[in-house]
């Protein structure tokens, strides 16, 4: 008889806009195929290089509002006038089957998910300095000066909630920050209770001696 799978890990990664969260998450997923990205729904327009179903499920506002009214979202939030939400979908089923999932959401969403999945692992990404964040946002060339100022003000509010997370990574060097992110995922997998379930047959051999 096949032993029950060890439950998957739900990782929550949050950061202020411009901290490098998306790039770090993409690099992590590339280095560790065992972790799957849970794709969120959003009403905002796709950015250059983004595609529907890979980066986000891009939907119209009325579609999002209907899904929200039908209770289809595990968490949702409004950011800069756009809505974001994580579909309940198969998250529970995926975790029960032993698959690791990653949610790339803001602190408000992280708070909601933690209430439903208290065993999830939350990670907050910090920029090295406030001025570095301003430089990154300006360098993207995507927003007007007014929008950048709004993002910087929101960043200060986001960072005020960092203490609620399990881990905090300062992205002052991309490679080092990625190493820190990978180290967290590896350490979670090596927790004793997870290893006991994952290698139940091995421990069983020694108990029979």
Curated annotation (Swiss-Prot):
The gene is gmk. One of its GO terms (cellular component) is cytosol. It comes from Thiobacillus denitrificans (strain ATCC 25259 / T1). Its EC number is 2.7.4.8. Belongs to the guanylate kinase family. The keyword Transferase applies. This is Guanylate kinase. It is found in: Cytoplasm. Its main location: cytoplasm. It is an enzyme of class 2 (transferase). Keywords: ATP-binding, Cytoplasm, Kinase, Nucleotide-binding, Transferase. SUPFAM superfamilies: P-loop containing nucleoside triphosphate hydrolases (SSF52540). It holds the Pfam family Guanylate_kin. It catalyses: GMP + ATP = GDP + ADP. The keyword Nucleotide-binding applies. Essential for recycling GMP and indirectly, cGMP. GO terms for molecular function: ATP binding; guanylate kinase activity. Residues 8-186 form the Guanylate kinase-like domain. ATP binds at residues 15-22.
């Amino acid at each position: 008889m096949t032993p029950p799978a060890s439950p998957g890990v739900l990782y929550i990664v949050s950061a202020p806009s411009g901290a490098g969260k998306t790039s770090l998450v993409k690099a992590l997923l590339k280095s560790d195929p065992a972790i799957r990205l849970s794709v969120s729904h959003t009403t905002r327009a796709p950015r250059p290089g983004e595609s529907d179903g890979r980066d986000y499920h891009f939907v119209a506002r009325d579609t999002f509002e209907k899904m929200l009214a039908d209770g289809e979202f595990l968490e949702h939030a409004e950011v800069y006038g756009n809505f974001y939400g994580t579909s309940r979908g198969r998250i529970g089923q995926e975790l029960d089957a032993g698959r690791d999932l990653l949610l790339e959401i803001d602190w408000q969403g992280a708070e909601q998910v933690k209430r439903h999945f208290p065993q999830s692992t939350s990670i907050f990404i910090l920029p090295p300095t406030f001025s570095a964040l301003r430089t990154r946002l300006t360098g993207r060339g995507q927003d007007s000066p007014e929008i950048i100022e709004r993002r910087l003000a929101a960043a200060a509010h986001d960072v005020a909630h960092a203490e609620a997370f399990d881990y905090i990574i300062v992205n002052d060097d991309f490679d080092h920050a990625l190493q820190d992110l990978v180290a967290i995922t590896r350490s979670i997998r090596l927790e004793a209770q997870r290893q006991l379930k994952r290698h139940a047959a091995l421990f069983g051999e020694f108990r029979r001696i």
